[in-house]
């Protein structure tokens, strides 16, 4: 059936999801999303720019439409191809388990553990600030400079230099009746 059912229809009025369903029916097997999009674009005679604009909605429609099923790794099929009981099995346990073994397994590296080669490139985060040692030494030295007896301080001996002339500070503290009237 597939694309033949659209033979008498205006292609501009067809939705991408309808065409994708028909393409999968005609193909009869799983297809990668990119292949589906290319086939839809070719059938509808749409430009690359127009397809790019409609692509997010098309992908959302495929996910939400109950007739499509994602087989993983962006491969899609029609749900009607699978018996209801086997849908979960098919999605969770692909037939090609050998492909999983061929994938590269990367060795995990922990940068915070010492390596077996004994490299000195490992950073000791507990002892990373040389200024910590300087501060500890300065604190020890400064304890001797000060005594608990503050008898050298004379509270009554105020220097005359501490008194400021009555400049702007005096002007700010003085308030005239004329100043109050200007604010109102």
Curated annotation (Swiss-Prot):
One of its GO terms (biological process) is regulation of DNA-templated transcription. Residues 88-107, 118-184 are annotated as: Disordered. The keyword Transcription regulation does not apply. InterPro entries: Asxl_HARE-HTH (IPR007759), RNAP_delta_N_dom_sf (IPR038087), RpoE (IPR029757). Residues 118-164 have a biased composition (Acidic residues). Signal peptide: none annotated. Pfam families: HARE-HTH (PF05066). Keywords: DNA-directed RNA polymerase, Nucleotidyltransferase, Transcription, Transferase. One of its GO terms (cellular component) is DNA-directed RNA polymerase complex. It comes from the Bacteria. Residues 14-81 form the HTH HARE-type domain. GO terms for molecular function: DNA-directed RNA polymerase activity. The keyword Methyltransferase does not apply. HAMAP family: RNApol_bact_RpoE (MF_00357). Belongs to the RpoE family. Participates in both the initiation and recycling phases of transcription. In the presence of the delta subunit, RNAP displays an increased specificity of transcription, a decreased affinity for nucleic acids, and an increased efficiency of RNA synthesis because of enhanced recycling. RNAP is composed of a core of 2 alpha, a beta and a beta' subunits. The core is associated with a delta subunit and one of several sigma factors. This is Probable DNA-directed RNA polymerase subunit delta. It comes from Lactobacillus acidophilus (strain ATCC 700396 / NCK56 / N2 / NCFM). The lineage of its organism: Bacteria, Bacillati, Bacillota, Bacilli, Lactobacillales.
